[in-house]
A protein has these predicted regions:
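Gly/Ser/Thr/Pro-rich low-complexity, intrinsically disordered segments
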Residues: 1-127
């Protein structure tokens, strides 16, 4: 996940020379609007925090939780399919999506939504 000096966001596996900052994360969930097949050993249902880019290069952060608990969510291997369903429900295509974090040491704050961490977290990404 990269923010470049020309005010553009990128989610790529290729280094970008003019990056202002970047985050190492993964795995990629969607690439070139195609769902990525994931095989995860010891996969568990956890809250998922995802960064996506639309065809218009709009950055969207998505947090996926279960209906029963803010700390549970889909298996990581199921997350690309869950994103596809979300995209259909909100009528939005995703060019690319990457898993940022999830589980008990993740949080999500906006003026409308607050999902707190269960375990203390070491840092925040503010956008």
């Amino acid at each position: 996940f990269i923010y470049s000096k020309d005010n553009q966001f990128s989610i790529t596996t290729t280094p970008i020379a003019n990056a202002d900052f970047g985050l190492q994360s993964g795995p990629l969930l969607i690439k070139d609007q195609a769902l990525m097949p994931l095989k995860i050993i010891n996969d568990e249902g956890r809250r998922r925090v995802i960064a996506t880019l639309t065809p218009q290069n709009q950055l969207i952060f998505i947090t996926i939780v279960s209906k029963d608990s803010e700390f549970n969510g889909p298996l990581l291997a199921e997350t690309p399919q869950v994103l596809e369903i979300i995209g259909q429900k909100i009528n939005q295509d995703f060019d690319v999506a990457i898993n940022l974090d999830g589980g008990s040491a993740s949080a999500f704050y906006t003026p409308q939504t607050y999902i707190k961490e269960f375990s203390p977290i070491g840092s925040y990404f503010c956008y």
